[in-house]
Amino acid sequence: MKSELIHTNQSESFLWINKVIIRHLIFSDLPQLEWNGEYQHLRQVYLNAYKNRNQGKNVLWVADLPQVGVIGQVFIQLNSVRKDLADGFFSAYLYAFRIKPEFRNTGLGSRMIGVVEKDLVKRNFREITLNVAKTNNRAIHLYERLGFEIVGSEPGEWSYRDHNNKLQNVSEPAWKMVKSISK
């Protein structure tokens, strides 16, 4: 189905995008976030994000293409221990933003960020922060095009428990980016 939707003639090549539903993640979506095993190691991270969503700490979004499934995701942390990222009132933190490779460069990522921004404005937030790997030039370009600005450097050090409950340490130097949003 995916290749049929994408690889048709030029005028029909992106008709699938009109069928994409951007909605809140539900529990049954969690296995699809593993992308056929590529992100299996993040299973506990996703489950914890879902639990935090149930406590009102996170807002989790997916892009769902009927008859294909979840093809994108973006998570928002409303309140963090690090108040410079998400303070619960003014600033929210965007993370775990992914679009499956075959659906990139189609406008879907921009559309998802637009949905997130509108939702955060309704919640009276005024700023979105994110960290992006310094080596991820395509993502940096997307964020800059969407109005985010680099405001600092982050060490990008964090840890998580993988699907085997083994502690994994990550070191991925990142740029901290910020965008002001308003009504």
Locate each region found by the language model.
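Acetyl-CoA-dependent GNAT
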Residues: 6-9, 15-20, 24-102, 113-114, ...
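A generic structural micro-feature
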Residues: 86-91, 124, 167-173
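Active-site acidic-Proline motif in GNAT/NAT acetyltransferases
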Residues: 100-102, 106, 134-135
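Short glycine-rich hinge loops at helix-strand junctions in the catalytic core
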Residues: 107, 124, 147
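Short glycine/proline-centered loop/turn elements that form peptide/ligand docking sites
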Residues: 109, 113, 135-139, 155-162
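Conserved GNAT acetyl-CoA-binding A-motif
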Residues: 120-131
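Conserved catalytic-core motifs of GNAT/GCN5-like acyltransferases
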Residues: 131-132, 144, 149-168, 175-176
